[in-house]
Amino acid sequence: MCIRDRGYSPSELTTSFDDVLASKPDIFIDVSGPIDPALDYCKTLLGMGVHVVSANKQAIAAGGQSLIDFARDNKAHLMFSSAAGGGMPVLEMCMRERGRITRVEALLNGTTNYMLGEISAGKSYADALKDAQDKGFAEADPSSDVNGGDAGAKIRLIALLGFGEEIVLDDIPRDTIENFALTEPAKGAMKRVATCWKDRNGFSTKLELKDLSLNNFIAQADGEEAHAIFYFEDGDQYKIRGKGAGRWPTTESVMADLFDISATYF
């Protein structure tokens, strides 16, 4: 296991990627955050035929279709169901229903959903953020959550897997919740909704703050929950829900990917 924190016994862990390569792993699991060096590590291992399970949405979004193709060409499995939606099977739905999907509406960041709920209940932005950090939903540096960078990476994955569209973060109009405060009580529920859709004008996406009716399925996501609605060309809809923040939803998705690879290849 390659880890940044050097506070563990050297006999159990390593901070050297060379040690990982020397161990000749069958599967590599990436639960780091930044694009670098994670993307390079993944490419190196996939090139060796090592299967990769990744929760690193930023690295996978940056790698895009070329990374997926690279894994296939090297007969390695690349799985990243935990990279968007936490415990909600958003990416699985995208891959299964690609070609039928016309629109996706989703809450893709459980941290900000929790914070917006607390702010709507009367807390200040600072108190809501501290509470989210204390509960393990928000990182010590919450900038990617609040400015939409985290949700933006997930939107890129939905665009790629659900619509076959490769976009960059700057293509996505994003509302920030940094220092957000309600100027007047919400009529319904304040949510930051990610939307991707394709129509005769092409493909579009956005991340926006919305005051939703309480009857709306998206509005019914409480705390760190995440909800999504898939719309299909035949008029059908499919609604999914799950935990969108915290260590356990991510862990469950990582383990599910690991078990899938184990069942297929070992």
Predicted regions and their residues:
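Short, small-residue-biased leader/transition segments that mark boundaries at the very start
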Residues: 1-3
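Rossmann-fold NAD(P) dinucleotide-binding segment
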Residues: 13-55, 59
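General beta-strand structural signal in soluble alpha/beta enzymes
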Residues: 14, 27-30, 53-55, 78-82, ...
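Conserved active-site and cofactor/substrate-binding residues in soluble primary-metabolism enzymes
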Residues: 15, 23, 62, 85, ...
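Rossmann-fold NAD(P)-binding glycine/threonine-rich loop
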Residues: 35-47, 57-88, 92-94
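Rossmann-like NAD(P)H-binding beta-loop-alpha module
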Residues: 74-138, 149-150, 157
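Catalytic, metal-anchored helix/loop core of enzyme active sites in primary metabolism
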Residues: 103-108, 116, 131, 137-140, ...
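Substrate-binding/catalytic subdomain of NAD(P)-dependent oxidoreductase enzymes
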Residues: 118-119, 129-227
